[in-house]
């Protein structure tokens, strides 16, 4: 399931665009996630009060968390599949503290793909979308393995 060098290049090319505005992209991803899958909002005590898209757009905390999420994902993507060291603490916190099911990681992956396509259509065509989907699938597969090692079957 690994990615070719060319696929990783497509992923990292568009990620360069994301890094120019991590907080903005992250906020858009979280808004898309919460609007598309409102049940995911229940995992975030500090965001539960955000009921409308306007509330979410006005939230500096949501923007900060979006930045945190995409910073962590960027560090993982840049490892081109050799992300064990980056994945371990993330799996630990998401399995034992936050109890985030793998299904929710699928939901946020869909949100990431949607946001990247809407914000960067020229750089995120079909090939880049397929490569990013593959990279996010690899991430989910590997984090699911770590979850099982930790005894979490979410």
From Swiss-Prot:
GO terms for cellular component: extracellular exosome; sarcoplasm. O2 binds at residue 65. CDD domains: Mb (cd08926). It is found in: Cytoplasm, Sarcoplasm. It comes from the Eukaryota. Its EC number is 1.7.-.-, 1.11.1.-. It catalyses: Fe(III)-heme b-[protein] + nitric oxide + H2O = Fe(II)-heme b-[protein] + nitrite + 2 H(+); H2O2 + AH2 = A + 2 H2O. GO terms for molecular function: heme binding; metal ion binding; nitrite reductase activity; oxygen binding; oxygen carrier activity; peroxidase activity. Keywords: Cytoplasm, Heme, Iron, Metal-binding, Muscle protein, Oxidoreductase, Oxygen transport, Transport. Residues 2-148 form the Globin domain. InterPro entries: Globin, Globin-like_sf, Myoglobin. Its main location: cytoplasm. Nitrite binds at residue 65. One of its GO terms (biological process) is removal of superoxide radicals. Belongs to the globin family. Monomeric. This is Myoglobin-2. It comes from Stenella attenuata.
């Amino acid at each position: 399931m690994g990615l070719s060098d060319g696929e990783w290049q497509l992923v990292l090319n568009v990620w360069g665009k994301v890094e120019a505005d991590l907080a903005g992209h992250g906020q858009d991803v979280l808004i898309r996630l919460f609007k598309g899958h409102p049940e995911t909002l229940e995992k975030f005590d500090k965001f539960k009060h955000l009921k409308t898209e306007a509330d979410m757009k006005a939230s500096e905390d949501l923007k900060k968390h979006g930045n945190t999420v995409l910073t962590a994902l960027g560090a993982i993507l840049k490892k081109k599949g050799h992300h064990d060291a980056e994945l371990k603490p993330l799996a630990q916190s998401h399995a034992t503290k936050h109890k985030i099911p793998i299904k929710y990681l699928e939901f946020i992956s869909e949100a990431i793909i949607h946001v990247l396509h809407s914000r960067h259509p020229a750089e995120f065509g079909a090939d880049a979308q397929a490569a990013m989907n593959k990279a996010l699938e690899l991430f989910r597969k590997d984090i699911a393995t770590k979850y099982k090692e930790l005894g979490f079957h979410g």
